[in-house]
Amino acid sequence: MISFHEARSKMLEGIKPLPPEKCRLEDLLGRILAQDATASFDIPPRDNSAMDGFAVIASDVAGASEQSPVILQVIEDVPAGQVATKSLKPGQAIRIMTGAQIPANADSVIPVEETSAGISNTEVRILRAVRPGANVRRQGEDVTSGQLLIAKGTRLRPQEVGLIASLGLTEVLVSKQPVVGIISSGNEVAAPGQPLK
């Protein structure tokens, strides 16, 4: 009779990697990735707003405060997922939602909480100065195109499956799952529910 460890070593010596197979996103949990997962695009794909507010040129609001607000003309509203049709000029702002692309010439976003309404819907009072780049998520800030995200051989947990989904993939190659069986033998083996001798 051989020991468990020796038996295990002998068994592993004879095992070869199984070929890969395609697996759908919803079936990936717990599977072993058979390919490197690399980004084919930047995330975010372009500069976008990190919060609801107003896209501005930072130098326009350099001296803004609650005691001395800067009034800017609002020239457009840009919902999340949309792109501004106008470019900012000095003295202008564009109302922008979280996730919307940063308009041309804008270099920062003032959070809506740091503004107050102007005389009409076409102007806004800016109550605080911001530095260039404030509240802007830069293109590729999270992931850059070509970046290795998940290495081949990784067991896929929920966070890796979510990352694969964010890449727009609906299936990837995983290692084929082995079929495993256990055979118990011997005259001392008892069926489930039978008393042990």
Specify the residue positions occupied by each region the protein language model found.
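Short, low-complexity N-terminal leaders and the immediately following helix N-cap/first helix
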Residues: 1-68, 95, 138
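Short, glycine/charged-enriched hinge/interface segments at domain edges or termini
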Residues: 55-197
